[in-house]
């Protein structure tokens, strides 16, 4: 069964219909049922609970969460895919126990009402909001961001009710199961990768703002500069040699680390590519790209890391949400440079949603130290 076109999925969404979206096999490898929150009814909630069986959640933009005064469920998110749960909610009025389909639909409508204020909701409750990353699936390839993106593109409030699809025996539904589910219920099915691809054809969260030659101790590179429309700041890409989409390209996506890149601090734990080592390796091969991403770490966070240099790396590694943001930004830059296949300077990693950027990791090259 072929996946439906994103254009057709958006049109169904515009008509108030549910759709199925599947993520990458190297991520959750799951499918979620999605519905624009503006179209949520008791019947829709009942169908989701009965047929999909997963946890019914409400995706909201960061701005929307702030307007409702919704705090994160926990101060430090340790979940594998950084799913950003806020505190659970209930409508202040018009509900009884809060768990019925009608009550949950009422809570959703209260949360997405154009004039909604914090007093319209109480906490905790039976609806679980999820805070989407700014930039949507171009920043993080998750169902949370996909829900907000689809609703926005269909002309609704950028918010969706979503639920994971489970099999009768309680196991997670995978692609073959999801295809049968979609056929049984007459629901269109698509992929987050295709949604990323669709958005990239019309919009980006980064924009190229400059290009020039840059002489370095490792040779002359072409320096490309990019403005980040979401996070602010400037990212750079240093390119040597001729880049062709069909040829595997040596690539390092590097987040600026003042402690390591400027003063040469050495961390406890497995060695990884420094900025200078990556530039030297590219120069030795005569062809490759080093993407240098701005570090949005606060001054306070940087100061707190200094005493931890001798501690295990897990004590100061970046959050999963930050990593996904960096992957999305770096992938957009690589796509802009015309790269299709990567020889990745770094340990083997699985990046969610890379297929949506038409990128394929052919090889991972660990640091030789």
Curated annotation (Swiss-Prot):
Site (Essential for catalytic activity): 126, 164
Pfam families: DHBP_synthase (PF00926), GTP_cyclohydro2 (PF00925)
Molecular function terms from GO: 3,4-dihydroxy-2-butanone-4-phosphate synthase activity; GTP cyclohydrolase II activity; magnesium ion binding; manganese ion binding
Positions that bind D-ribulose 5-phosphate: 27-28, 32, 140-144, 164
Annotated spans, GTP cyclohydrolase II-like: 202-369
Domain of life: Bacteria
Record's cofactor remark: Binds 2 divalent metal cations per subunit. Magnesium or manganese.
Catalysis: reaction(s): D-ribulose 5-phosphate = (2S)-2-hydroxy-3-oxobutyl phosphate + formate + H(+)
Region ranges (DHBP synthase): 1-201
Keywords attached to this entry: Lyase, Magnesium, Manganese, Metal-binding, Riboflavin biosynthesis
Binding site for Mg(2+) 2: 28, 143
Positions with a binding annotation for Mg(2+) 1: 28
EC number: 4.1.99.12
GO biological process: riboflavin biosynthetic process
Co-factor(s): Mg(2+); Mn(2+)
Top EC class of this enzyme: lyase
GO annotation, cellular component aspect: cytosol
Pathway participation: Cofactor biosynthesis; riboflavin biosynthesis; 2-hydroxy-3-oxobutyl phosphate from D-ribulose 5-phosphate: step 1/1
Entry-linked InterPro entries: DHBP_synth_RibB-like_a/b_dom, DHBP_synthase_RibB, GTP_cyclohydro_II, RibA-like_sf
HAMAP family reported in the protein's UniProt record: RibB
Protein family membership: In the N-terminal section; belongs to the DHBP synthase family. In the C-terminal section; belongs to the GTP cyclohydrolase II family.
UniProt function note: Catalyzes the conversion of D-ribulose 5-phosphate to formate and 3,4-dihydroxy-2-butanone 4-phosphate.
Name of the protein in its database record: 3,4-dihydroxy-2-butanone 4-phosphate synthase
Gene: ribB
């Amino acid at each position: 069964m072929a996946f439906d076109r994103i254009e057709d999925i958006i049109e169904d969404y515009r008509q108030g219909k549910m759709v199925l979206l599947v993520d990458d096999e190297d991520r959750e490898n799951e499918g979620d049922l999605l519905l624009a929150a503006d179209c949520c009814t008791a019947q829709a909630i009942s169908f989701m609970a009965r047929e999909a069986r997963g946890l019914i959640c409400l995706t909201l933009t960061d701005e929307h969460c702030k307007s409702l005064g919704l705090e994160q469920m926990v101060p430090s998110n340790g979940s594998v895919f950084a799913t950003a749960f806020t505190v659970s909610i209930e409508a202040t009025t018009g509900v009884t126990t809060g768990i019925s389909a009608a009550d949950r639909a009422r809570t959703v409508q209260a949360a997405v009402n154009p004039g909604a204020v914090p007093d319209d909701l109480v906490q905790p409750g039976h609806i679980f909001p999820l805070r989407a990353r700014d930039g949507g699936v171009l920043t993080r390839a998750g169902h949370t961001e996909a829900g907000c993106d689809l609703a926005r593109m269909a002309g609704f409030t950028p918010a969706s009710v979503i639920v994971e699809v489970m099999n009768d025996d309680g196991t997670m539904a995978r692609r073959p199961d999801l295809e049968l589910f979609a056929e049984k219920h007459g629901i269109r099915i698509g992929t987050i990768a295709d949604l990323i691809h669709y958005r990239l054809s019309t919009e980006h969260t980064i924009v190229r703002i400059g290009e020039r030659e840059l002489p370095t101790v490792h040779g002359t590179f072409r320096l490309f500069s990019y403005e980040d429309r979401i996070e602010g700041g400037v990212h750079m890409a240093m390119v040597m040699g001729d880049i062709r989409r069909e040829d595997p390209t040596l690539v390092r996506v590097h987040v600026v680390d003042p402690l390591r890149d400027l003063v040469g601090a050495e961390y406890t734990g497995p060695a990884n590519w420094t900025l200078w080592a990556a530039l030297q390796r590219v120069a030795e091969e005569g062809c490759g790209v080093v993407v240098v991403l701005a570090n949005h770490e606060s001054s306070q966070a940087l100061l707190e890391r200094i005493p931890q240099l001798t501690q295990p790396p897990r004590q100061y590694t970046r959050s999963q949400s930050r990593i996904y943001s960096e992957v999305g930004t770096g992938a957009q830059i690589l796509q802009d440079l015309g790269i299709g296949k990567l020889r990745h300077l770094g340990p083997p990693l699985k990046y969610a949603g890379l297929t949506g950027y038409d990128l394929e990791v052919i090889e991972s090259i660990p640091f030789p130290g």
